């Protein structure tokens, strides 16, 4: 948990300064912005101009890393990100993803065929209003297409200048190694938060060995760890959480002790629960860059409020001891 290996740098391209980290050789702000919620993944419909303003506000607050995907919307998130960052495109890094059958009207079907990847990339470039993608992910491993073939396409796209770095999302250690051997990966994305720690044992050793960065999505536990959700919350069917075991009425009630623990530690550190949850992640490894998402300007300000305060090794151990006493439901 030492900070000694942390690449301490500052982002001087926006009005607020934020520490930067490296995903292999890709330098980004220590926190990125996940741009999935703004297209209604958790219910609700959001005004385009409001979301453009939110993305630009994130940049003003020091965020230089924006995460999207062709399947978000579909297409809408990429379009909004592209329009929002156009005035300062060269000052930010965009991560997007391919791997689902969006153009075939099958957004849940996996598709990483080489010809499909190329069409997806051309579409993303157009929607993002750019000539290159800073970080291109395979959204999910396609069992019908060898990862070595996907990596080969990534190598070609890199040589063509259409993408600068590539990554994988929700990939196993074995797939990561196979792909990395063909075209070195810069980042792997997976769910990771205080209450979801599988990556620590499944892929962290591989990432550390190969020098690959890690980009956790849902670092705030889909808002559960922020303290705004209690055991009485119920989710509309349009909200993705309505289908998740961790958000059933029984699980919410059962898991409330974790919220209490996070609140206690947040108070102890003089931060909000959301800030503590991000602080916990940033303190784990120097090569982790979480991408919380939000549709609310006030919440955005909260997320970027603490990016250079860390937990000590002793504090991490103390928190984990207390956490280990809580049995979670729905995991």
Across the structure, where does each feature detected by a protein language model lie?
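A short acidic, helix-capping loop that chelates divalent metal ions and anchors anionic groups
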Residues: 37-42, 101-107, 299
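N-terminal binding-site loop/beta-alpha segment at the start of enzyme catalytic domains
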Residues: 8-93, 328-331
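Beta/alpha (TIM)-barrel catalytic core signal, keyed to glycine-rich beta->alpha loops juxtaposed to Asp/Glu
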Residues: 141-330
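Conserved beta-strand positions
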Residues: 33-35, 68, 135-138, 168, ...
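Short, acidic/polar
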Residues: 45-58, 113-127, 174-176
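Alpha-helix N-cap and loop-to-helix initiation/capping positions
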Residues: 46-50, 76, 80, 108-116, ...
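Active-site groove signature of glycoside hydrolases
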Residues: 125-143
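Short, well-ordered coil/turn segments that N-cap beta-strands
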Residues: 26-31, 62-64, 88-92, 130-134, ...
